[in-house]
Amino acid sequence: MNDQRKGSDAEPTTHFGYKNVPESQKAEKVAEVFHSVAAKYDLMNDLLSGGMHRLWKRFAIELSGVRTGNRVLDIAGGTGDLTRKFSNLVGPTGQVVLADINASMLKVGRDRLLDLGVSGNVEFVQADAEKLPFPDNHFDCVTIAFGLRNVTHKEDALRSMLRVLKPGGRLLVLEFSKPTNKLMSKAYDAYSFAFMPLMGKLVTNDSESYRYLAESIRMHPNQETLKSMMVEAGFDRVTYHNMTAGVVALHRGIKP
């Protein structure tokens, strides 16, 4: 977190993309972005990743170890890609909670899953990752896919996730990260800051939201930093896997 003070009584600031804003304003600004993109979020994911996001999520599911009867929390679950898969894995004796802080994203996810016939073992909860409204030691697995970078106090969110996991439970963080070679890094910069806003303008008439998303990726902790943050929060056996030359990384940690 970028915590800056102009005086002893000044409110701490944090980054919103490349801008510094008062901490109290970040959640509202992020909410505005996702209210704007919610209706076409799935379409834009497919266009901007060339469908690769489905492969990244599939790998996260394979590494989750989720099985019949488990209880899973899908934070920042958005339109429900992971929740739908987990619903099949846990079966009628398990439960999946799709949690999202953004009401528009939550509605899109609920409507989409209901249209697909996914309902019996899925619950939808509007929740803040920093203050999860669930009991201690409650879930076998917690996931957050492409959501942690939008959280103001990431350390608080990681500790909240640790609290709600059962001992031995797994946290999986799927997030954009730092490319592992210079050529990919340069290509990714050009793609992110030129193509992403352009596609946002053409498809959703909103280039600024996609410019923020590109900037938020650059401001997110890199692979090793996030690993250290998870260890500091209390997770054990923290590892990460780079995908697509580090464009995306999947971190996994275990609650002791």
From Swiss-Prot:
GO molecular function annotations of the record: 2-methoxy-6-polyprenyl-1,4-benzoquinol methyltransferase activity; demethylmenaquinone methyltransferase activity
Pathway: Quinol/quinone metabolism; menaquinone biosynthesis; menaquinol from 1,4-dihydroxy-2-naphthoate: step 2/2; Cofactor biosynthesis; ubiquinone biosynthesis
EC number: 2.1.1.163, 2.1.1.201
Binding site for S-adenosyl-L-methionine: T79, D100, D128, A129
Disulphide connectivity of cysteines: none
TM annotation in the entry: none
Key words of the record: Menaquinone biosynthesis, Methyltransferase, S-adenosyl-L-methionine, Transferase, Ubiquinone biosynthesis
Enzyme class label: transferase
Function: Methyltransferase required for the conversion of demethylmenaquinol (DMKH2) to menaquinol (MKH2) and the conversion of 2-polyprenyl-6-methoxy-1,4-benzoquinol (DDMQH2) to 2-polyprenyl-3-methyl-6-methoxy-1,4-benzoquinol (DMQH2).
Recorded family membership: Belongs to the class I-like SAM-binding methyltransferase superfamily. MenG/UbiE family.
Designated name of the protein: Ubiquinone/menaquinone biosynthesis C-methyltransferase UbiE
Organism: Pseudomonas savastanoi pv. phaseolicola (strain 1448A / Race 6)
